Each structure stands twice: as C-alpha cells, then as structure tokens.
C-alpha cells in the first residue's frame, strides 16, 4: 500500500514539474534605461545628472553654500508630516522645537536671499539659538552668517551694520540625545565663541571634517551691556535683560562651506506597484568605486566607498496602519486620509513661544502609527554584494532604500543600475491529497 501511495505521489510531482519549469523569471529594474529621477520619495545629496542613467553623491564644490544643495527643509525639530524619518529631511529650528512663523523660524536664513532676514525680537538671549540639520554628514570647514543687504532697525540703524555682538558655534557629526534637551547646550565641538564681534560678515573656519549638525547660539556681550547703559542714559526703560529692547544683531543668511563628497547620500524609491503578486529572487546591481583626482573622477578599486541596498515588499500600497483615539482612550484603525487630513496631532502649544506638550487622548486626535507586518516584510538585511538572495516574502509592491557610503572626502561610489529577479506565483492556492491508485477517491 505504501509503495502504491509513493508511486502516485511521484507521478503527481512529475506532472507538476513542467509547470514549475515554465515559470518565467523576469527582473524589476531601476537605473540604466529606467530613470532614477522621479521614482523617489527621498533623495539627500543625490546627483541624478552627472552620468545619465546612474546616481552618485553630489560633490560639494569650493565656494558653494552647502545649504543650497538641499531642499524640502522643515522648521521643526520633530516634523508632524506623515512619513518623516530622522536623517531623510534637512531641518532648521529655532529654540527647543522650532515653529511655523516665517518671520522668526529660520526659513529666511536658508533662502539664499540677502534681502530677507529674521527681525530682532525683545526676548531673552537664552531663546536665541538655531540648530541646522543637513540630514547627512558632509565635508565642511567653514560656517558663516551675515547681515541683510538693506533695511533699518526701528531706531534707524542700518541693518547692514547690525552685527551680532557675541555668539557660539558648535558642530556635531551624528545624531544624539542632546537635541531632546531644552536650552542652548553646545554640540560635540565648539568651533567659535567670540565675546565682542563688530563684523557684519562672519566666517568661522575649522579643520575639514564630516558635520551633520550646526548650532548657532546668541551669547551676552559687553557690547550688549553698553547698549543697555546707553538706553538708560537716554531715559528709556528696560534693556537686554528684561527684553524691553530688541536684541542687537540681525541675520540674513547662514552659510556652510566645504569640499568633497558626503559621508552618506540616500535614495528611497516610491512604493512601486508591480500589478500582481510576485516571488522575489536575487538582487543584482552594478556599482563603480571612484576617486576625485585633479578635477576628474577616476575609477579606484581601493576607494573607501560602497553602495548599500535594502528592499521590502508588500501586498498593499501602504506599510503603515493609522489609529485614532476613542472616547475611552483606546485606539481604532482609520484610513490614512482621515489620519492625515481630519485628525489633530497629539501635541500642542499654550503660547507661540512655548514648547510643545502632549495633549490628553480624545476622539479626533491622532494616535499611533504602527507597521503593517501582516502585509509588508521588514526591510531586508543591508546588501553590499551583487547577486545575493533577498529572502523576502512574495508581494505585489516593492520599495528600495539605497545608501551611498564614503569615508574619504575624495572617494565616492556610482550606482549604475539595480535589478531584482521576480516570477509570478504559479497558483494562488494549491490543494491536494495522496491516495492509492486502486482507490483514487477513498
């Protein structure tokens, strides 16, 4: 009997084998003849134009303000937009959290326009600090700022001469917990802290290094004390100490300069609809390590640069699940459209200059966003070698995240294209049973 069952199973497998062999293996591709540009949701320091069909890091050229190489800035430390991920969007924020007021939130300080500026305010010096996050570490050696090209203070002082008396500049290569601490604490390294400055155009030089974060903080100076004394002699009340008089110093632009390639450049593709559920095989890519020598990029097998690729797949078009608070304080699932357009955030301010505070849960308020692991795989293990299997579940949607790494200012990697093996599912569902040939329907 057992031999009969074995024979039946062998015949069944033999009959199925031709169908398996006929499963067509194709590829899904990015790069080469399939453009990179326009297929991304995030790109930080990515050059789409240098070599057609390929991507590589943007090179920081001498004399070019690095701030101008970045776009899609936010003026909050913790942006409320859906999909924000730390390190995938540049930020500038004032004080502890930032705000949306364009007259003071710093947006005028990164617009490359010397006629726009943040007006001085009659508020404490302790609130006068800005933090700049370039999203990735870049090779930098100079931080600068300057006064506006025109205009006047309320007392008639030309803004062009309204220099900042005292300030501190500090820098840091990577993210840390310091940004969650309130107040103008210096970052990992202080590169300048003058106590008496009269220059309207300031340039602070330091040894070139990878820097992601810069913090500019206003400090008290004897020049401020002199202005306060002059104010008292003239019969006016108040001064820098009690915020009755606007602080000295007006800034029009921040500037950051350096030379070379960033430590990281990142690219996140859109979520791509493949049309039908697919099985996925190996990931292939072509990447070329290069070095910038005497004004030209030359191939350099020993370049300290490489590409790292992660992939995830899913069965619907959104890897997240969105929730709203109920009357009992619990959470219920809602659509992304309702979460994004109809619900309020869980944070608010009691005044324009106050920090954000957590509101009590209530209906109409955003609750958690969780990962839909039932329908989406997690990101694959980062792959740095072409031809390795992805080991991902089947899906009808795919997304790619690419990081172009470099640990030398002159070295970089160019990614020409990548492709993923895929094949359609042979059957949505297969049912069967083993039976003796003499009794095929027991």
Give the positions of each predicted feature.
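Beta-strand-rich ligand- or partner-binding modules
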Residues: 22-442
């Amino acid at each position: 009997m057992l031999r009969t069952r074995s024979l039946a199973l062998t015949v069944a497998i033999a009959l199925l084998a031709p169908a398996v062999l006929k499963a067509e293996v194709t590829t899904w591709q990015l790069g080469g003849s399939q453009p990179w540009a326009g297929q991304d949701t995030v790109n930080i320091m990515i050059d789409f134009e240098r070599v057609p069909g390929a991507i590589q890091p943007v090179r920081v050229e001498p004399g070019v303000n690095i701030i101008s190489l970045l776009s899609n800035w936010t003026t909050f430390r913790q942006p409320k937009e859906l999909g924000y991920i730390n390190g995938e969007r540049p930020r500038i924020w004032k004080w502890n959290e930032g705000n949306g007021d364009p007259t003071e939130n710093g947006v005028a300080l990164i617009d490359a326009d010397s006629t726009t500026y943040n007006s001085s305010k009659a508020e404490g010096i302790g609130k006068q600090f800005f933090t700049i996050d370039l999203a990735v570490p870049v090779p930098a050696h100079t931080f600068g700022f300057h006064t506006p090209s025109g205009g006047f203070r309320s007392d008639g002082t030309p803004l062009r001469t309204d220099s900042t008396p005292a300030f501190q500049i500090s820098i840091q290569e990577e993210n840390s917990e310091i940004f969650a601490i309130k107040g103008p604490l210096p970052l990992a390294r202080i590169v300048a802290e003058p106590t008496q400055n009269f220059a309207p155009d300031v340039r602070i030089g330091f040894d070139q290094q990878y820097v992601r974060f810069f913090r500019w903080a206003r400090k008290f100076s004897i020049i401020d004390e002199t202005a306060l004394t002059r104010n008292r002699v003239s019969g006016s009340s108040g001064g820098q100490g009690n915020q009755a008089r606007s602080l000295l110093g007006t800034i029009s632009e921040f500037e950051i300069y350096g030379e070379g390639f960033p430590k990281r450049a990142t690219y996140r593709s859109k979520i791509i609809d493949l049309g039908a559920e697919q099985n996925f095989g190996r990931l292939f890519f072509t990447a070329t390590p290069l070095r910038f020598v005497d004004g030209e990029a030359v191939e350099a097998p020993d370049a300290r640069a490489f590409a790292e690729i992660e992939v995830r797949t899913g069965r619907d078009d959104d890897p997240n699940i969105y929730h709203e608070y109920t009357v009992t304080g619990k959470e219920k699932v809602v659509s992304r459209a309702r979460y994004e357009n109809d619900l309020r955030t869980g944070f608010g301010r009691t005044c324009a200059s106050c920090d954000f505070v957590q509101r009590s849960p209530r209906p109409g308020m955003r609750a958690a966003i969780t990962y839909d692991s039932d329908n989406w795989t997690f990101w694959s293990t980062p792959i740095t070698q072409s031809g390795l299997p992805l080991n991902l579940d089947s899906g009808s949607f795919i997304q790619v995240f690419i990081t172009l790494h470099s640990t030398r200012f002159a070295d970089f990697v160019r990614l020409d294209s990548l492709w993923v093996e895929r094949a359609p599912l042979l059957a949505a569902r297969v049912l069967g049973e083993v039976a003796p040939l003499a009794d095929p329907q027991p």
